[in-house]
Amino acid sequence: MADTQAKDGYYYTEKHEWVKVEGDVALIGITDFAQNALGDIVFIDLPKPGKQIKAKDSLGTIESVKAAEDLYSPISGEVVETNATLGSNPQAVNAEPFDTWMVKLKNIQTSELGGLLTAAQYKEYVSKLD
């Protein structure tokens, strides 16, 4: 999967989550590599707004026809919103993994972004998984 997508302007984890900072909030989702590995996503369980999350805490569960995996937060913050569309259309993550955020955090700890991977670093990391 050396051609796995990774977009500039996003930060990545080795567990295949991404974070995109927009102003004072962060959007979190899963990468193209993750959705390919999971296969058809059938259900996503996410936290309620107001929940305080620390980096590497579980944000919920993603279930596919192949497996169930935990979604981990790349950074700390407070859940301000979850993507309501995913309740009725979890497959949106398969179609557009970078445009389909799952959780929106506020009061984010931007200092934690330095511990994440850039797009180039993530592509290199994924290329070694083949």
Curated annotation (Swiss-Prot):
<dbReference type="GO" id="GO:0005829">
    <property type="term" value="C:cytosol"/>
</dbReference>
<keyword id="KW-0450">Lipoyl</keyword>
<dbReference type="InterPro" id="IPR003016">
    <property type="entry name" value="2-oxoA_DH_lipoyl-BS"/>
</dbReference>
<comment type="subunit">
    <text>The glycine cleavage system is composed of four proteins: P, T, L and H.</text>
</comment>
<feature type="domain" description="Lipoyl-binding">
    <location>
        <begin position="25"/>
        <end position="106"/>
    </location>
</feature>
<dbReference type="InterPro" id="IPR002930">
    <property type="entry name" value="GCV_H"/>
</dbReference>
<feature type="modified residue" description="N6-lipoyllysine">
    <location>
        <position position="66"/>
    </location>
</feature>
<comment type="function">
    <text>The glycine cleavage system catalyzes the degradation of glycine. The H protein shuttles the methylamine group of glycine from the P protein to the T protein.</text>
</comment>
<comment type="similarity">
    <text>Belongs to the GcvH family.</text>
</comment>
<dbReference type="InterPro" id="IPR017453">
    <property type="entry name" value="GCV_H_sub"/>
</dbReference>
<dbReference type="GO" id="GO:0019464">
    <property type="term" value="P:glycine decarboxylation via glycine cleavage system"/>
</dbReference>
<dbReference type="InterPro" id="IPR011053">
    <property type="entry name" value="Single_hybrid_motif"/>
</dbReference>
<dbReference type="InterPro" id="IPR033753">
    <property type="entry name" value="GCV_H/Fam206"/>
</dbReference>
<protein>
    <recommendedName>
        <fullName>Glycine cleavage system H protein</fullName>
    </recommendedName>
</protein>
<dbReference type="GO" id="GO:0005960">
    <property type="term" value="C:glycine cleavage complex"/>
</dbReference>
<dbReference type="InterPro" id="IPR000089">
    <property type="entry name" value="Biotin_lipoyl"/>
</dbReference>
<dbReference type="Pfam" id="PF01597">
    <property type="entry name" value="GCV_H"/>
</dbReference>
